[in-house]
Regions:
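Short, surface-exposed coil-to-beta transition loops
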Residues: 3, 52-56
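Active-site-flanking beta-strand signature of metal-NTP-handling nucleotidyl enzymes
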Residues: 2-9
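An amphipathic, aromatic/His-enriched active-site/gating alpha helix that lines ligand/cofactor pockets
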Residues: 24-40, 50-51, 60-97
Length: 104
C-alpha cells in the first residue's frame, strides 16, 4: 500500500478558490482515470505549525504501478482545462509529490 501526497502552496487569501478548483479536477479524475483505483483520499491544509497556504492532496494506492498509471492519465487532453484552472493558484516551484510505503 502506498500513500501518495501531492503538496502545493497557494498565494495568501486564495486557498478557497484553489480548493474549489482541486475539487472539480478531483471529481473528474476519480471518475475517468487511473485514480479510480484509489483506496482512499483526503485533502489537508496547514493549521498549526503549517502554513494555511500549504495544501496536501492525498491518495492511497494498492501498488506503485497504479499510482504511476493514474499520473500518466493526467497528461490526457480532457484534463487540460482542469489543470489550467488550478495552475493560476499554484505558487511556481512549490508543487511536488511525496510517496510513502505503508509498513504497519
Amino acid at each position: 500500500m502506498f500513500v501518495c501526497q501531492w503538496h502545493l502552496d497557494v498565494p495568501y487569501g486564495r486557498q478557497g478558490e484553489a480548493l474549489r478548483a482541486m475539487e472539480a479536477w478531483g471529481k473528474e479524475k476519480l471518475a475517468s482515470s487511473g485514480f479510480r483505483k484509489v483506496k482512499g483520499t483526503r485533502v489537508m491544509v496547514g493549521h498549526i505549525g503549517g502554513s494555511p497556504s500549504h495544501i496536501v492532496d492525498e491518495y492511497v494506492f494498492e501498488t506503485l504501478a497504479d499510482f504511476e498509471a493514474a499520473i500518466a492519465d493526467m497528461g490526457e487532453a480532457r484534463f487540460r482545462a482542469l489543470s489550467d484552472r488550478l495552475a493560476e493558484f499554484v505558487v511556481p516551484g512549490s508543487q511536488h509529490w511525496e510517496v510513502f510505503r505503508v509498513v504497519g
